[in-house]
Amino acid sequence: MQFVDEFRDPELAKSLLQRLQKIMENQPHFTPENPLYLMEVCGGHTHTIFKFGLDRLLPKSIEFIHGPGCPVCVLPMGRIDVCIEIARRPEVIFCTFGDAMRVRGRLGSLLEAKAQGADVRIVYSPLDALNIASNNPDKKVVFFSLGFETTMPSAAITLQQAKKQQVKNFFVVCQNITIIPTLHSLLSQGQVKIDGFLAPGHVSMVIGSEPYQELCDTYHKPFVITGFEPLDILQAILMLVTQIVEKRCEVENQYKRIVHQHGNELAQQAISEVFRLKASSEWRGLGEIAESGVELTDDYQCFDAEVHFACQPHQVADDPDSRCGDVLIGKCKPADCPLFAKKCNPDNAYGALMVSSEGACAAYYQYR
């Protein structure tokens, strides 16, 4: 398949691995006991790494830390409870992406709410939800707007369309979050040793490569934005390792075929019209992070489901036995969690990292 097979070429992969091996052999201070730690921020990268066994092909002196770049994985239990309360209303059709259906809150999951009679539907875009609202004028249709900057443009454009069409029965629960403040929080805590970052490709397609420069300058960590194919990731690792060995600290872009310095400016304009930063947002396992989430601007407040239904915020503590938060910041591996593959598995996903198709625990379970 054109533009896919080229990025999975075994001979090219072998060449990149040999170059990496040669570099690491000349760095005796990096050993399996004291490895070079690279964080892949995005869950999509995590799955590519495990699906193609890249972690087993790399020198033993390179180790991955799995980052918080999966929006379902960092979804607080209290936010699920808000969604379930709204979905249970008889006048509501609740629309969500499929990954969010099985995430558990104190009140259960949206999948369980559907089984109990709530009208909960899986959609593939917010425009699908808007069409449902147009076709069901006697119902209140609520879309669960979830995701990083990757999904924010489609949500923003949908709300612009709803406003233009004067749709009165369409609302959103806003759970969109931003990547740069999250990485600021992670690095400022200094709890985990990270030598370099594989930055997410899809988010960067929207925000561009420029926003990472502040992180690079402040924390003196190199970043390489990368795509999602095996050769993308191997080339990005080579670029990161080269920077570290040469004692450089830069933002480099391996994913130039998709990502540009300033990102998608039309998408950014739509986002800035519809959304504004919140003072603080809660993340599962990470707590409150300043300016890491968004809410609707004044011109779009009429579409806010939580305002319309007068929802009260929920604070729900995570299970103390679960180590989702530690996995998210790289303090432990999924297999170190006492629930992994026992109480928590894909058929009975107790933690959000096992629910999502991008979760590190799901990747470990499926490929290890």
Predicted stretch roles:
Residues 173, 191-260:
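A conserved active-site cap/scaffold subdomain adjacent to cofactor or substrate pockets
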Residues 1-138, 152, 156, 160-165, ...:
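Metallocofactor- and cofactor-centric catalytic cores in central/energy metabolism, strongly enriched
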Residues 235-326:
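Internal helical hairpin/lid segments
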